[in-house]
């Protein structure tokens, strides 16, 4: 669903199978609507729903997680599998949130952040390998 360019997906972002990406157009009382803005190097797990939210660079959305309108996932932050980040909630940088509704569990350490970055590199290499294979 794209309304006047209201969905943006950044470089090297990976969206897994079965995920839903959606936005809401402007409407009375909400002249800007709820665009979906996904930064660079983001990982979105299988069957996730991201709906009119913002995911900053290197954010992570776990399998089956939901992020609602105007929610924000900070840089290097992780929304756990199955979590629901409700409307207007804001996750800070390097935070782990889980539950329904999602709440902050803790800050992420360097090892967790590096693990997410390794995932980005893995999927980026998969894309390059696939592109090379179909050219041959």
Label every model-predicted segment.
Residues 43:
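Short proline/glycine- and basic residue-enriched helix-capping loop/turn segments at helix->loop/beta transitions
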Residues 6, 11, 16-24, 28-38, ...:
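Glycine-rich hexapeptide-repeat left-handed beta-helix
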Residues 2-3:
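Short, small-residue-biased leader/transition segments that mark boundaries at the very start
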């Amino acid at each position: 669903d794209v309304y006047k360019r209201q969905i943006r997906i950044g470089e090297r972002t990976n969206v897994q199978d079965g995920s839903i990406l959606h936005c809401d157009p402007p409407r009375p009382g909400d002249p800007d609507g709820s665009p979906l803005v996904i930064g660079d190097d983001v990982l979105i797990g299988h069957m996730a729903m991201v709906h009119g939210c913002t995911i900053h660079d290197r954010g992570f959305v776990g399998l089956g997680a939901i992020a609602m309108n105007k929610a924000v996932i900070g840089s290097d932050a992780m929304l756990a599998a199955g979590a629901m980040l409700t409307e207007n909630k804001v996750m800070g940088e390097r935070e782990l949130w889980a539950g329904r509704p999602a709440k902050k569990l803790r800050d992420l350490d360097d090892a967790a952040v590096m693990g997410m970055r390794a995932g980005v590199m893995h999927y980026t290499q998969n894309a390059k390998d696939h592109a090379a294979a179909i050219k041959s």
